[in-house]
Amino acid sequence: MEKVCFMITPIGKEGSDVRKNADEVLDYIVNPICKEYGYSVVRADKMANSGLITKAIIEQIITADLVIADLTGNNPNVFYELAIRHSYRKPTIQIVKGEIDIPFDVANMRTISYETTLSGADVAKREIEATLKSIEDGNSVHNPVSEVSTLLNISANSTEENAEVLSTLL
């Protein structure tokens, strides 16, 4: 069974700079490296589903084997979808065009910077590949939600002896 990578990204209107960037990232960075690792890439505007698009998007966010989230433009929909993905503790790769500041809540997570030039796309593909290898090797998923959730679970099952240590971590 083929693995699925869902692409969370600002899409923009047909013909817009936002759409052009989304298409270039998909075609020249994400698709080539994901195909190499056996993933089919799905993006919201390319989905053939009929009915509620939001339902189909959320289903992909939850069930996809991998999500690549493009934080370029600080799009609210992208961050909403990324937060949903975080709550499921599943593999996610964050990317952003250039050296753009990203919001505090996700800034401490590794974010791969990309450019849509030939050399920039090659650099981004190598970095995504390194992250994909780590995911394929079974390394655990870390994000702000999973970290706090783990600590809360430990805290709920802790003894009085280690409660003080846990309180400093929370």
Predicted regions and their residues:
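Cross-kingdom TIR/SEFIR domain
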Residues: G73-S134
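Flexible, glycine-rich phosphate/dinucleotide-binding loops
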Residues: E14, S50, D101
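C-terminal interaction surface of TIR/SEFIR-family domains
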Residues: T111-L170
